[in-house]
């Protein structure tokens, strides 16, 4: 028997043991995420942007879960773009922006920024202006190999995993 679930009304097959995010990616269904880094199988759920609403068979009320950490189940109905999901994603994005230096023009990723791309995708074309952002944490350039500007960090954990899995060093925590 083939396993299947429904994404926004579209029937999608899957194999046991996959997460909702993995199945969505295979089916070319975009779910925004900032921490999931598939080449490294890095899906800690830290950014909380991959929120989806899930209805198990027989459910009348859905629950909102992170797609990267939730195993997909037979017959689930999954909504990636409804109003409830968007509002929760926007709230999560506001929380990320509240502790993020938004001087985008000074950032090396300006114009090629996943954070800005996801904000636009979820309906936040103009990021909230947190002009009272003062946190200016020290810029760490004490190492020639690693330069860290924690004011731009969104705590996704990607750099830690690349350092550990790709570089084999594990110098970051």
Regions inferred by a protein language model and the residue ranges of each:
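N-terminal cofactor/phosphate-binding cores enriched in small/glycine residues
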Residues: 5, 10-74, 84-88
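Fe-S ferredoxin-like electron-transfer domains
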Residues: 48-173
